């Protein structure tokens, strides 16, 4: 039985940890996850999914602000390998060097493409038709370590980032376990990343503002890429309206203002983009309200009027 220290925080992390926990070839001797966050709406402490699972299964866990602070604790465990999945914190080289087989990392992109903290968002924003799960060795440089194996998959054109996340969460645990067993049993070899790297860094606040000057394909990719979180937005009458679903309608023969509402129906709010391309907004969130289909909104009181403009 191989001893593992697991580093992770997200829902994806929890799903991977869960399958590792139930696999008879592994012993989870400790888990390292991010410190609890505070929900600013109700001021309550919110543990990560990973911490909740550890409490449920009585697994030893640590929540350091910096991983190096628990070096002595981890050293005592004499684990065979570290496994990192969406940990969200820099791992010091001294921590990596504690493990005879170093620390491996599951990264949901076809490395060296989309190194960084938001590869799923940028897969959709870039309109990629294919992607991959990559198991790599953790090194000092971000997501630049040698690759053990990659598992390719097709990206559905209708997926938003939430849909892609569901796919990754369903397929990552078994792939990670397969690779971990191969690595520990020395059945295979590492290979260096080939090609020019690109980056999928965390989405900045200013990037959440959707750009009406884009062509419709890029605009729709941004809508899907920011959905369901953080949600891309447009300004209307001084309020930020989040857009969660939209589709292309047609190119208009008339000259419209950028962002102009050209039609409102149960099917959606049609607005003009650059070059008079018309898209239909189908799912939105007005400040203070829940996310709703446009068909729900137009039955009641709403601020949208043909001729007015989103910005």
UniProtKB/Swiss-Prot annotation:
One GO term in the molecular function aspect is: methionyl-tRNA formyltransferase activity
User: What EC designation does it have?
Assistant: 2.1.2.9
The portions of this protein that span the membrane are: none
Detail which positions bind (6S)-5,6,7,8-tetrahydrofolate: 109-112
Q: Which reaction does it catalyse?
A: L-methionyl-tRNA(fMet) + (6R)-10-formyltetrahydrofolate = N-formyl-L-methionyl-tRNA(fMet) + (6S)-5,6,7,8-tetrahydrofolate + H(+)
Pfam families referenced in this protein's UniProt entry, alphabetically: Formyl_trans_C (PF02911), Formyl_trans_N (PF00551)
What GO cellular-component annotations does this UniProt entry give?
cytosol
What InterPro entries does the record point to? Answer: Fmt (IPR005794), Formyl_trans_C (IPR005793), Formyl_trans_C_sf (IPR037022), Formyl_transf_N (IPR002376), Formyl_transf_N_sf (IPR036477), Formyl_transferase-like_C_sf (IPR011034), Met-tRNA-FMT_N (IPR041711)
Keywords recorded for this protein, A-Z: Protein biosynthesis, Transferase
* Gene Ontology biological process terms, A to Z: conversion of methionyl-tRNA to N-formyl-methionyl-tRNA
Instruction: Describe the family membership recorded for this protein in Swiss-Prot or TrEMBL.
Output: Belongs to the Fmt family.
Task: Give a short account of what the protein does.
Answer: Attaches a formyl group to the free amino group of methionyl-tRNA(fMet). The formyl group appears to play a dual role in the initiator identity of N-formylmethionyl-tRNA by promoting its recognition by IF2 and preventing the misappropriation of this tRNA by the elongation apparatus.
This chain's protein is named Methionyl-tRNA formyltransferase
